[in-house]
Swiss-Prot record:
Domain HD: 228-329
Residues that hold CTP according to the record: 8, 11, 91, 137, 140
Record-listed ATP binding positions: 8, 11, 91, 137, 140
Superkingdom of source: Bacteria
Family: Belongs to the tRNA nucleotidyltransferase/poly(A) polymerase family. Bacterial CCA-adding enzyme type 1 subfamily.
Cofactor: Mg(2+); Ni(2+)
UniProt cross-references to HAMAP family, sorted A to Z: CCA_bact_type1, CCA_bact_type2
Keyword terms of this UniProt record: ATP-binding, Hydrolase, Magnesium, Metal-binding, Multifunctional enzyme, Nickel, Nucleotide-binding, Nucleotidyltransferase, RNA repair, RNA-binding, Transferase, tRNA processing
PANTHER family: MULTIFUNCTIONAL CCA PROTEIN
Additional remark text: A single active site specifically recognizes both ATP and CTP and is responsible for their addition.
InterPro entries, per the entry: CCA_bact, HD/PDEase_dom, HD_domain, NT_sf, PolA_pol_head_dom, PolyA_RNA-bd, tRNA_CCA-adding_enzyme
Reactions the enzyme catalyzes: a tRNA precursor + 2 CTP + ATP = a tRNA with a 3' CCA end + 3 diphosphate; a tRNA with a 3' CCA end + 2 CTP + ATP = a tRNA with a 3' CCACCA end + 3 diphosphate
The protein, known as: Multifunctional CCA protein
Gene: cca
Length: 413
């Protein structure tokens, strides 16, 4: 029995990155030998065991053979005669087909170290094309390592295009698509994930609402980048710089979906694109089974982001109604989230990346003023039932009006 550290832990150690999870491969052992050594079996489809002390995963070396459609259509063979090289060959990318033995020696039968040094994401073998989930995984790795200048090998991107054109991605379940997307959205450069999907044709299949934005023009005065799809990826990049929150990044991604519905004869203007985009956000989220809290914020951002941009001319009553509409009284975090997405929208434009966004500050300040109005005083003044809410709203409007006159007066006409 020989045990090897494999995959991501070896890869990240060679890149000088923190190693989070460790996966191990055991060569020359049977399931019974693992159980006798105190390991706990957890794998249902193939032999995977948990170490009795560390609880890290130890898998018996195995091979896989395509036996059906999609990413689940595989038959696994695990036995003591399966070699380490055979196990590594089933991996997706050469940089993940690395192993390290007890002496610290690197086993690299598929030249993963060479590709690490060349900053290349290259598939190990033609078997890559048998698993459509790998298209999304490669896109996610491209996003994860974009800051290290990794790129996808030409032959791998060509294979990804072939897989997409053959309809392989249609076998993916919504849950798997969302899981990969969720992980990609938390990387340093989530926009790269969607760009790669577009480059191989997968964006049109999996995210048609986003793909439809490419080629849709916006007024050059406000959007020097012109293309709404390009702007969408720029805003996502900016959102990733402004916030680590998945909610903020996803909402930013969806903020302009409504522009894809604008009739061509009305281009490049997109009046009413915010409210129009709400149903597309709902459609996308239902299809991919996006969590409700992410969906709800994305719908609010789609509907109200343009309103935030006009903050200096908003009436105090409109500002308080906005807080009502986003349910800020019960979910105060939404004020900050919407401020960040609106800022990402403004700064996600060519030449505006370093722009100040005072509207975000004003939104936060107005919220602090409005929520500081004490409910207790309204109740103690003798108001009852629905009168409490009406009086509280009046006092909040008055407080915001007083603040706005001093801190955010409307621009001179």
């Amino acid at each position: 029995m020989k045990i090897y550290l494999v995959g991501g832990a070896v890869r990240d150690a060679l890149l000088g990155l923190p190693v989070k999870d460790k996966d191990w491969v055991v060569v020359g052992a049977t399931p019974q030998e693992m159980l006798d050594a105190g390991y706990q079996q957890v794998g249902r489809d193939f032999p995977v065991f948990l170490h009795p002390q560390t609880h890290e995963e130890y898998a018996l070396a195995r091979t896989e053979r395509k036996s059906g459609s999609g990413y689940t259509g595989f038959t696994c063979y695990a036995a003591p005669d399966v070699t380490l090289e055979a196990d590594l060959q089933r991996r997706d990318l050469t940089i993940n087909a690395l192993a390290r033995d007890d002496d610290g020696q690197i086993i690299d039968p598929y030249h993963g170290r060479r590709d690490l040094e060349a900053r290349l994401l290259r598939h190990v073998s033609p078997a890559f094309g048998e698993d459509p989930l790998r298209v999304l995984r490669v896109a996610r790795f491209a996003a994860r390592y974009a800051h290290l200048s990794f790129r996808i090998a030409d032959e791998t991107l060509a294979l990804m295009r072939e897989m997409t054109a053959a309809g392989e991605l249609e076998h993916l379940t919504p849950e798997r698509v969302w899981k990969e997307t969720e992980n990609a959205l938390t990387t340093r450069n989530p926009q790269v994930y969607f760009q790669v999907l577009r480059d191989c044709g997968a964006l049109r299949v999996l995210f048609p609402e986003i793909d439809a934005l490419f080629g849709v023009p916006a007024p050059a005065k406000w959007h020097p980048e012109i293309d709404t799809g390009v702007h969408t990826l720029m805003t996502l990049s900016m959102a990733a710089m402004l916030s680590p929150q998945l909610d903020v990044r996803f909402a930013t991604l969806c903020h302009d979906l409504g522009k894809g519905l604008t009739p061509k004869n009305l281009w490049p203007r997109h009046h009413g694109h915010g409210p129009a985009g709400v149903k597309l956000v709902e459609q996308l989220c239902q299809r991919l089974r996006v969590p409700n809290d992410l969906r709800d914020l994305a719908k609010l951002v789609a509907e109200y982001h343009d309103l935030i941009h006009t903050f200096p001319i908003l009436q105090p009553k409109t500002i308080v109604k906005l807080f009502d509409a986003i349910d800020a009284w019960r979910k105060p975090q939404r004020v900050e989230q919407i401020a960040l997405t609106s800022e990402a929208d403004v700064r996600g434009r060519t030449g505006f990346e370093a722009s100040d966004y005072p509207q975000g500050r004003w939104l936060r300040e107005a919220w602090q003023v409005a929520q500081a109005v004490p409910t207790k005083e309204v109740v103690e003044a003798g108001f009852k039932g629905i009168e409490i809410r009406e009086e509280l709203t009046k006092r909040r409007i008055a407080a915001v009006a007083n603040w706005k006159e001093k801190r955010c007066p409307p621009p001179a006409s």
